[in-house]
Amino acid sequence: LCVYIPQANAQKVKDQEFRRVVVTLTSGEKVEGYVKRGWHAEASAFKKSNYSFKMTATPDDKEVLKYTADEVVCIDYTEKTENNPDGIRWESRELASPSIADRYRTIRRLVCLENTGEHASVYWWKDWDVTTNQQGMKRRLVTYHGIRFHDEGKEGEIVYIPMLVNSVLLKDKKPGLKEFSKNWFKGKEGKARKKEADADGDGTWMLDMYEAYLAQQAK
């Protein structure tokens, strides 16, 4: 059976391949389709950032499926590029989000896997930072990087931004990590590390820092 696809339509479908994904649900089921644009934080001014998304079976399908971070394990983009030879992956993880009432509060969000090592993985995501001053409320889009430790057992889904790694939040779980992390960019070697981290522009430095911390703990 041969189906004729007009060249213009074929090109249109091809142009949408960057949206093609395989979504793994918490049930283990895999759903293939095309994720709708505008689900990232940039377009989430009035809803939870990086929490829900919509997809369709084909680029032009009218039937829309909606999923949340509570329903999925990960979103794997099928398109491979030079910068992402394995494809882009968004994972559903718990973000450490302490509050005055609960130091250990977490919120489940979708975060993009940036790099993974033997003992930890690092992620990035964007969210809105809201500040209030005499002029009123100011919103700005901020890119965050965070680290997830592989040895936390059932709690291994938690992703911590550097500021929280440097806090008392991990005092009991990772003795000495707070001080080790704070000193990572200090001194002559630290300045060289900071320069390299700034040039990279990602969170990979956290993997190096954590490996060095583990090596020190093993002595």
Predicted regions mapped to residue ranges:
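Aromatic-patch recognition
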Residues: 34-187
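Bacterial Sec-dependent N-terminal signal peptides
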Residues: 1-15
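Eukaryotic, compositionally biased intrinsically disordered regions
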Residues: 11, 29-30
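Conserved glycine-centered beta-strand/turn positions repeated across beta-sheet architectures
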Residues: 21, 31-35
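Short strand-coil-strand connectors
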Residues: 26-27, 61
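C-terminal partner/receptor-binding element of secreted or periplasmic proteins
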Residues: 184-219
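A short beta-strand micro-motif
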Residues: 19-26
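Intrinsically disordered, low-complexity regulatory segments
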Residues: 15-16, 31, 216-219
